[in-house]
Every structure is written in C-alpha cells, then in structure tokens.
From Swiss-Prot:
It comes from Lophophora williamsii (Peyote). This is Cytochrome P450 monooxygenase 76AD94. One of its GO terms (molecular function) is monooxygenase activity. The gene is CYP76AD94. Glycans are attached at residue 110. It is a single-pass membrane protein.
Length: 506
C-alpha cells in the first residue's frame, strides 16, 4: 500500500472511529435520559389546565376554599398551572409532616416573590421574603433575640396587662352606655398600642380615636393586596405593567406606614443627650443602625412586617374567637364558669392565671384551627426536584401550604367544620409547629417569630372580656344567624365586623 493510500486509510479509520464514538455517546445519553424520565416520579395530580391561562379560573374569590374543594377530588398533594407557574398545593397533615420533617431545606429556603411585594424593594429588605442566607439569618437573629426574645416578652408582662386593662375600661364604658363594641377594632387598637409602646414607648391610637380605624384600614389594605391573586405573578410578561395596580397600591400603603415610623425615628434621633434612653425596641434598632448592622430602609420594612403581622392577624383571630362564642353560648358559659371557679368573683385575671384555664386555652386553639392567622404559609419555591408523598415537586415550583385545609383535615379532626374546643382537652396538641394538623404559625426554620406574643395576647384579652362581661347581639338577633362570611387576604377577616353589646356582670 503506497503512502497516500495508507494515510487516507488511517484518516478514514480515525474518522469512522470518532463518528462511531459520537453516535455511541449520543445513544447512551438518549437511553440514560429515557431511563431517568422513567424513574422520575410524576407530578402530583390536579385539574387539567387550559391553554395559556392554565388553572387560573379555578382560584375564585376565596382560593383557600377552592383549593380545599379541588383537593377532595385530586388528593392532598395537588399540582396546578397558574399561567406559566407550576404550583403545588399541600392540603393535609400527612403531606405537611413529610414536607417539614424530610424536605424543609429544599422546600423552605427560597420564596416565590409576589410582584406586589417588590414595591419599594420590600422583598429585599425584610426577613419574610428573603431566601435563607446570611442576611436572612442576621434578620432572624435580630428579631428572635433582640426584639421578641422570651426574656423581653417576660419583662413586658406588665405592659400587656396595662393594655388589656385599657381594653377592659373601654368595654366597661360601652356597657354602661349600652353601646356596641366593634370587637375587631377594639382588639386591633389593643394590639397596636401594645406594639407601639413596646417598640416606641408611645401609643399610636386610642379606642375612641379615628386614628385606630385609619391604621386598621391601612394594615388591611397591605394584607389584602399581598394576599390577593395577581395576574402579574402568573404571566411574567405582565410584571412590568402591574395590570391590576396592586404593586402601585402597595407602594403607597408602605409609604404611608413608613412615614409614621420615620416621624418617630427622626424625633428619637434628634435627642441630643446620649443618656436619654427609653429601653425599648427602637433603641435596640437604632443601636444596630449606628453599628451598621441594619440600614434605615431595613428598619423601616422590618417595622412594616412586624406591625402588619402583629396587629391584623391577632385582632382578626380574636374577632373570630368571639364570633364563635356568640354562636355557641353554652361554650361561652363553660369558659366563664371555668374562670369563676379558678379565680372567684373579685380577682382580676393575670397572665400567670392562664395555665390554670385549660378550657380557655382550648377555645384559642380551636379558633386557630378553624381560622388560622394566615390562610396559606407564604409561598415557597423548590430549590431542586424534590420527592414528596410519592410525587415530584419540580425545581422552581411554587409551594402553597393551605393552613385552612390542614385545620379541616378529616383524617385528623372529627367533625372538622364544627367549633368544638373540647377536642383539645383530651389530646396534647399545641400550636408551636410540632403537630402538623395545626400549624397556625407555620413550622420549621420559617416559623413565625411573633407566635408567643400573639398567643399570650389572645388568651389574656379573651379571658378578661369573658370574666367581666356577658355578651349579646344588638336588636335581639339570633346568634345562630350571625354572619360568618369572610374576605380573603393573607389573613381572613370577617366581611361584616362583629359588633356586640357587653353586659357588665354584677
């Protein structure tokens, strides 16, 4: 074989060898991909999506109820396509338990950010929306250890007692004049003044002022706008246009609330003497600001989060508790009898008395079961493909835990739609994220840091108003006909405020 022919043969052999290897490699990749696809578990079941819009029409005006009804058909772990967003809905305690115990990190580290909370860069400046990161851990530490630590809560026990005493005096005045009490507004004012006194050493409103209702309306606007469905979240091309105007409204609400905080902060910073300390939370925040651990924007948005969560959700839950008791007079009488048995007629209730009142605490738990402070846990985003309950939660999917449905899981709760505090007298279930049929404050690393403060205030306010007053509806309305309709936001408020008449006990 001559040299040119030999070279041609060698090149041809090399070419065919390389071609064969490429084909073989491609074949192996295809086969491996097919095997992987065969091994990968399917998405959770769900209703068939429509072209382009997916399952958006399934949401309805009350998505928590819509999702709970769909879960009865498709199962406790369900997938929907909301526009272009794959959304996984958790609707049972079994699924929630597996999610938090086995997959808390990949399913809780990131958030799906609603377009609305990008207003004013809120999502970058607050712990609620940040991914788990050094910055998030720093915020969590500041909140847990500096602002809402058990030591600080214990030290402000007398402050809570004083605010509840103001509530009592307002209700007593109403009882003497035969006036109705707007229970939600009264509880909101109490919660607002507790936080403002704890944080700023001043009160932002009082029970007879219009300021209280203005704050309540402003906070609800924020809660409603963050919670409501938004087309900009489902169709990325719309996020720049804000078609529903939600982001613009939320930016305006943030500005109004921050303006209040900034007025207080400017006044505090203007104090010339370094010895003028108030020993309150604002002093702590400003010290962290001076040490460059927090920026002023971060302080502003941290306060927005805390005052949102600490006023509206607490007052809404309290209003639901009183509404359930009005509808169930025998339950109210039983709670009042327990208080009388433990404390007698003369002694005013103290926070230290609450552990002696198991039925009262059962009423609070039952209210939190039926009316959780937030309807859904804030939306999470899967970091990677995750196996959950025999299905695949795909990377970047949005995960919504339907707390309203968990509290009505028939596998956990007998007669789940019935208000029955007695169920908690025979079981050791708490609200601290360990029992997955009752997660009113969440679970895992993102559990609500204000849980203990909210629970203490709810029990103390309820005990005080039940100890000193009987309650009735105006115009001799039958309690069974009480309107229990709800309006949707991050929390659920009564559509029609609960206005009832206090009758002072002899």
């Amino acid at each position: 074989m001559d040299s040119p022919t030999l070279l041609l043969f060698i090149f041809a052999s090399i070419f065919y060898f390389i071609t064969f290897q490429i084909v073989k490699l491609g074949f192996n990749v295809v086969m491996t991909s097919k095997k992987t696809k065969r091994r990968r578990l399917p998405l959770p079941p769900g209703p068939k999506p429509l072209p382009i819009i997916g399952n958006v029409l399934e949401l309805g005006p009350k998505p928590h109820r819509s999702f709970a009804n769909l879960a009865k058909v498709h199962g406790p772990l369900m997938s929907l396509r909301l526009g272009s967003v794959t959304t996984i809905i958790v609707s049972s305690s079994d699924v929630a338990k597996e999610m938090f115990l086995k997959n808390d990190q990949p399913l809780s580290s990131n958030r799906t950010i609603p377009n609305s909370v990008t207003a004013g860069d809120h999502h970058l400046l607050t712990m609620s929306w940040l991914p788990v990161s050094p910055k998030w851990r720093s915020f969590r530490k500041i909140t847990t250890f500096h602002l809402l630590s058990p030591q600080r809560l214990d030290s402000c026990c007398s402050l809570r007692q004083a605010k509840v005493q103001q509530l009592f005096e307002y209700v007593l005045e109403c009882s003497r004049t035969g006036q109705t009490v707007d229970i939600g507004k009264a509880a909101f004012t109490t919660s607002l003044n507790l936080l403002s006194k704890l944080f700023f050493s001043l009160e932002l409103a009082h029970h007879r002022s219009s300021k209280s209702q203005e704050f309540k309306d402003l906070i609800w606007d924020i809660m409603e706008d963050i919670g409501k469905p938004n087309y900009a979240d489902y169709f990325p091309c719309l996020k720049y246009f804000d078609p529903c105007g939600i982001r613009r409204r939320l930016a305006n609400s943030f500005e109004k609330l921050i303006e209040v905080f900034q007025g207080i902060i400017r006044q505090r910073l203007s104090l010339s003497s370094g010895s003028d300390t108030h020993n309150d939370v604002l002093d702590v925040l400003l010290q962290l600001y001076k040490q460059k651990e927090l920026s002023m924007d971060e302080i502003n948005h941290l306060l927005v989060d805390i005052f949102d969560a600490g006023t509206d959700t607490t007052s809404s839950t309290f209003e639901w508790a009183m509404a359930e008791l009005i509808k169930s007079p025998k339950t109210m009488e039983k709670a009042q009898a327990e208080i009388k048995l433990v404390l007698g007629k003369e002694s005013h209730i103290q926070e230290s008395d609450i552990p002696k009142l198991p039925y009262l605490r059962a009423i609070i738990k039952e209210t939190l079961r039926l009316h959780p402070p937030t309807v859904f846990l804030l939306p999470r985003k899967a970091e990677t493909d995750v196996e959950l309950y025999g299905y695949t939660v795909p990377k970047n999917a949005q995960i919504l835990v339907n707390l309203w449905a968990l509290g009505r899981d028939p596998k956990v709760w007998e007669n789940p739609d019935v208000f029955l505090p007695e169920r908690f007298l025979t079981c050791d279930i708490d609200v601290k994220g360990r029992d997955f049929g009752l997660l009113p404050f969440g679970a895992g690393r993102r559990i609500c840091p204000g849980m203990n403060l909210a629970y203490r205030m709810l029990t103390l306010m309820l005990a005080t108003l039940l100890q000193s007053f009987d309650w009735k509806l105006p115009n001799e309305l039958n309690p069974r006909n009480l309107d229990m309709d709800e309006k949707f936001g991050i929390a659920l408020q009564k559509t029609k405020p609960l206005e009832i008449i206090p009758v002072c006990k002899d």
